[in-house]
Amino acid sequence: MQNETRSLWPHKDLLDVDQLSKDELLHLLDTAAQFHEINRRPVKKVPTLKGKSVILFFAEPSTRTKTSFDVAGKRLSADTFSLAKSGSSLQKGESLKDTALTLEAMNPDVLVIRHSSSGAARFLAERLACGVVNAGDGWHAHPTQALLDCYSLRQVWGDTFEGRTLCILGDIAHSRVARSNVKLLTSLGVRVRLCAPRTLLPAGVGNWPVEVFTDLDAAVRDADAVMCLRLQLERQQAGLLPDLREYSNRYCLTPRRLELAKPEAKVLHPGPMNRGLEIASSIADAPASLVLDQVAAGVATRMAILFLLATRTDGGR
């Protein structure tokens, strides 16, 4: 497996999903499936990355993604080290570049970074010799979330993405998850619909390869899957949406609305959820929900990413 992977994986970094060819994407998902199977065993730890080191540099708050990467690294027997902005020299005025160069002097094999500035991961990848994984940069991209979402859908759909319809619902304007999912899923032939109040749709969305809706009933009709996004409550304070009750009345995914989708439609949510606001509790806990499947897929997918980058062909970008 390792020799084959080295011959197939040329990328030093994972910055966004559009850097991957279809063959590379499928190879990554197939690798994740192998790790997913390992994660179901009584003994989940494998020596695949023993002796490798992974630094988790989260300059923006995170619980789910950071924990998922930490678990992924440890299950591969890598040494993982966590650094948050509150405990780093960034708080003392040190530049991002100098902080990263200091970390690289410790010779990690992979640096996983989350940062509030769009482009931060690329900035580091262009300057550091170690592999860099973008765990979210501003509103720009969240490639590992899109990859685990794709993996979760593949578990249901198989490889028949072409012609499927996915509705992404919620705060699209400020969502790096939506942006990466649109890029990835449309490249596989999925028809993507975006649904949000006009104030939560991004500028230039008319140029995206999607259909845009402000009416949720129309957006979910005959969809194969619906992805709800977390509503960031500070958006109401900024005047970007009406009061929360009105938002819930118009944009909460309820059983009645899900019935408008196809009978076998699945529901996704990147978490954390605001139950009763963007998604009804009965839907979040229903058999149609893939929310917990996404969590399991996240560990397996991130194991695959760390493995592929840490054992990559030298010289790839």
Swiss-Prot record:
Belongs to the aspartate/ornithine carbamoyltransferase superfamily. ATCase family. Heterododecamer (2C3:3R2) of six catalytic PyrB chains organized as two trimers (C3), and six regulatory PyrI chains organized as three dimers (R2). It catalyses: carbamoyl phosphate + L-aspartate = N-carbamoyl-L-aspartate + phosphate + H(+). The keyword Transferase applies. Keywords: Pyrimidine biosynthesis, Transferase. Pathway: Pyrimidine metabolism; UMP biosynthesis via de novo pathway; (S)-dihydroorotate from bicarbonate: step 2/3. NCBIfam families: asp_carb_tr (TIGR00670), PRK00856.1 (NF002032). This is Aspartate carbamoyltransferase catalytic subunit. InterPro entries: Asp/Orn_carbamoyltranf_P-bd, Asp/Orn_carbamoylTrfase, Asp/Orn_carbamoylTrfase_sf, Asp_carbamoyltransf, Asp_carbamoyltransf_Asp/Orn-bd. The gene is pyrB. The keyword Transferase applies. SUPFAM superfamilies: Aspartate/ornithine carbamoyltransferase. L-aspartate binds at residues 92, 176, 230. GO terms for molecular function: amino acid binding; aspartate carbamoyltransferase activity. It comes from the Bacteria. Carbamoyl phosphate binds at residues 64-65, 114, 142, 145, 271-272. Catalyzes the condensation of carbamoyl phosphate and aspartate to form carbamoyl aspartate and inorganic phosphate, the committed step in the de novo pyrimidine nucleotide biosynthesis pathway. Its EC number is 2.1.3.2. One of its GO terms (cellular component) is cytosol. One of its GO terms (biological process) is 'de novo' pyrimidine nucleobase biosynthetic process.
